[in-house]
Amino acid sequence: MPRGMMQRDSRKVSEEMKPTENPRVKICCIQSVEEAWMAIEHGAAAVGLVSAMPSGPGPIPEDLIAEIAAKVPPGVSSFLLTCLQDADAIVDQQRRLRVNTIQICDRLPAGSYQQLREALPGVSLVQVIHVTGPESVDEAIAIAAEVDAILLDSGNQSLAIKELGGTGRTHDWRLSRAIREAIDVPLFLAGGLKPENVAEAIREVRPFGVDVCSGLRIEGLLDPQKLAAFFRATDETQTNTD
């Protein structure tokens, strides 16, 4: 996924943002340079690098995030997953780590996106919407104009210890499809995806991209067999998407 593909300044309601039979694949919770290259060699368009989170799997130290991001080749997006809600803190984090995409896992105060745009030109912004009910559709519609893409996940921000991703749970894909049909930016689908269900998810939602973490891991490590099976399953949808 070329870095500029999702940049808002050139965004249009175009075919590359429409439902796709060949969704991009983002492999998240990358733990090492070796895992990043394994994902890329299998066809990943993006790798996800998880910074400190209140809960969930996958966080790695910032120095390791920076090391991996520096070795991601051109044409592949390096996503920084952040739970920070202060725009200045997010800017500082990106400047330390030099990723080309920021995945914002929690809600931001009003005006934050403009601050990020001004401070980080050329860096793509992806907002996570945790699909908990019909209200998530309205939330996604309201935010879509501010960002380069929306990513749907299955966390819960209302808990005492927030869940901001990595739950391994699916959510209601009918709501995901409703969101995809209502917005004009690319939509990534996450939440409980694995080789056994990703083809069904793609057929149901028809997202721009799919995102997976725990569904490809054994004892926390990226499993090459599961990884290969996931890509085979996504490939199957190219001729079977309705």
Protein language model features and the residues they cover:
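Conserved N-terminal beta1-alpha1 strand-loop-helix module at the mouth
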Residues: P2-G209, S214-T239
